[in-house]
């Protein structure tokens, strides 16, 4: 059975404080047990627990590890789903291996985030990403970025393309009407940074596809829910590249 993961400011210290210490206490972690401390940026420390309180956990670090980031790096652009499906989308994307997640307020997005509530929603996504990363035993916790509109996303994609050599389309958009299969993508030409775009429940409009300039691909004949599409796409990319 894999060890439980906890986020620590400094895994090498063998110390947990704050919410993570409370979490360990609630999980009834006891002295003598082993846990894995991570910093969310690839550093991990196998730790034998020596004491547990609701506010602090102390332990002895037995082994330190540096986990390399998967390559190629995949950023998921997730159109914001409505209700509880939003957190499900984040959960599945993290389980699938997303390296970063960008909330997207597309033209057809049903769930709109008012300006005065955006910060709270982003924090919910970040909390979910951390929880899911620990559950998935990941040393890297995906970054959840600030939400973007379609025009802002287009600018992000152009900026990412400008940093690369060549003019390959490095962004893939999952689309039910695409004629190309994801298995036919020449991933070697996309470089070390791939953007995977998932549309809303109402679908991505033709005008948005044109603005984004992304490469439409399909996973198969089935139409997936927006909350599960990124997971399926990430699994396909994992199998078709060196990520897995």
Language model: regions and residue ranges:
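N-terminal positively charged helical leader segments and presequences
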Residues: 1-66
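RNA substrate-binding interface of SAM-dependent RNA methyltransferases
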Residues: 66-170
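Generic beta-sheet signal
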Residues: 74, 169-172, 192-198
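Conserved beta-strand scaffold positions in the cores of enzyme catalytic domains, especially
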Residues: 144, 171-173, 214-218
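A C-terminal functional module that forms or caps the active site or interfaces directly
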Residues: 186, 190-210
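Structured adenosyl-cofactor binding patch, chiefly the S-adenosyl-L-methionine
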Residues: 206-244
């Amino acid at each position: 059975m894999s060890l439980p993961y906890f986020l620590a400011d400094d895994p090498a210290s063998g110390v947990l404080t704050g919410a993570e210490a409370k979490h360990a206490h609630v999980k009834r972690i006891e002295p003598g047990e082993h846990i894995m401390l991570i910093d969310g940026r690839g550093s991990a420390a196998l730790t034998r627990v020596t004491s547990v309180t609701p506010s602090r956990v102390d332990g002895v670090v037995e082994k330190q590890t540096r986990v390399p980031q998967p390559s190629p790096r995949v950023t998921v652009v997730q159109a914001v789903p409505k209700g509880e499906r939003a957190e499900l989308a984040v959960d599945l994307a993290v389980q699938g291996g997303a390296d970063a997640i960008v909330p997207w307020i597309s033209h057809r997005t049903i769930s709109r985030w008012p300006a005065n509530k955006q910060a709270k929603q982003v924090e919910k996504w970040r909390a979910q990403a951390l929880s899911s990363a620990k559950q998935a035993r990941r040393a890297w916790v995906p970054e959840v970025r600030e939400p973007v509109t379609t025009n802002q996303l287009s600018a992000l994609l152009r900026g990412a393309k400008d940093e690369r050599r060549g003019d390959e389309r490095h962004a893939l958009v999952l689309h039910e009407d695409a004629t190309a299969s994801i298995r036919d993508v020449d991933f070697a030409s996309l470089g070390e940074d791939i953007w995977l775009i998932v549309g809303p429940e109402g679908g991505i409009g033709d005008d948005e596809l044109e603005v984004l300039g992304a490469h439409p691909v399909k996973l198969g004949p089935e139409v997936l829910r927006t909350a599960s599409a990124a997971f399926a796409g990430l699994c396909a990319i994992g199998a078709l590249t060196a990520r897995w």
